Amino acid sequence: MRLILVGLYLFLYFTVGMFYLGAEWLFGRWNQKASMLRQYRFVQWGFRCILFISGVKVHAKGTENVPEDEAVLYVANHRGIFDVLVTAIYCKGVTGYISKIVIKKVPCLRVYMKRIGCLFMDREDIKQSLKIILESIEQVKNGISIFIFPEGTRNKNREDATDIATFKEGSFKVAQKSGCRIIPVAITGTAEIFEDHLPWIHGGHVYVTFGEPIDMKTLDKEEQKHIGEYCKDRIHDLLVEQQA
């Protein structure tokens, strides 16, 4: 039933939303930053509605660590498709997610994602991946935060909620080259909403923790060299706290 309701809602949202995006495209060009923020707020509202319809209760901690006027690199473990929804609603500034390139084939979704700074990466194409990393660096320099899941794919280990696959170090070039801070994010419970019951949606509780910002300039050379492993350890600690 929830899947049907979400499907109906998305149909209405995308239908009405295309008119809204058209208006923003027409009138928002005089102040593109303000227009982008309005569109991001529209997406956040849509995500909150989907979570409500899906019966998802999000328990968030550390939201005081989310900056309002500073572009950062968010780094999180990846459990399910709902990871995007339960984190995006707490990002205070425009935040673009790095997504799999296959999502680019979904017409309406692609338009929305591009409007809020999302980028599409083909992890099988090294040259294209590097291009996306460079674009991410420029976006951060222009005030748009970037959200990545460095595991590269959803973790399917259901026996250990604190398990995290190896982080791909290349993703962290965004922080290394732009000088932005890194916000570690821990997520628990999203797989139980959808992936564990495909194709059905089950309501439930999701836990999201935003850790204290990591400034690479304050780390020693060894920690900077292995920043992916350092962030992974920080997120693991947050996941352990969620299980306590």
Please annotate each region the language model reported.
Residues 60, 74, 97, 148, ...:
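Generic preference for hydrophobic
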Residues 130-244:
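Non-catalytic C-terminal accessory region of glycerolipid acyltransferases
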Residues 64, 126, 188:
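Residue-level "edge-of-site" marker
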Residues 47, 118-122, 153:
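Short, basic, glycine/proline-bearing loop/turn elements
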Residues 1-29, 38-41, 58, 64-67, ...:
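Membrane-interfacial terminal anchoring regions of lipid-handling membrane enzymes
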Residues 48-58:
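Transmembrane alpha-helices and immediately adjacent membrane-cytoplasm interface residues
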Residues 17, 21-42, 53-54, 68-126:
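Catalytic core of membrane glycerolipid acyltransferases/transacylases, capturing the structured
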